Amino acid sequence: MHILEFLQQKYRGQVLPKLIIISFSAGVVGAISAAWGWQLMGGKIEALIAFDGWGVPLVGNFPIYRISHDYFTHWSSSLLGKGDKSFYADPPVNHLDLWRSPQQVIGWRVELTLDGKESHNQCSLRTFFNLLLA
């Protein structure tokens, strides 16, 4: 909850801005908690982007995007909330490479189609991330 405390102090008495929260690994736990807390304070969440938040339930009334270093992490994490769009590295990469070298990570962008099926498109993590922020 340190994130939320920081935001409360920074924006005390001001109009609360819309936030895009980017989180990595164990930080995803604090990020999803802060996102919910921010909304309870009257703020808006534009998106939450979770890099390798394995085992963290991600549910919200705002866009959530999961990024995983391999297919197993992608699949097993999706049981706790898929999010709107997701990406997994294929071939698998080291956990830290997601953060360190997104331009070198190749994998699959996964989105739900209008008929509820998954669409898989190959791209780099950098391309996927740029699409999210566009």
Question: Model-predicted segments: where are they?
Answer:
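Active-site catalytic motif of lipid deacylating hydrolases and related acyltransferases
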Residues: 1-16, 67-75, 81-134
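Serine-dependent carboxylesterase/thioesterase catalytic core
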Residues: 2-86
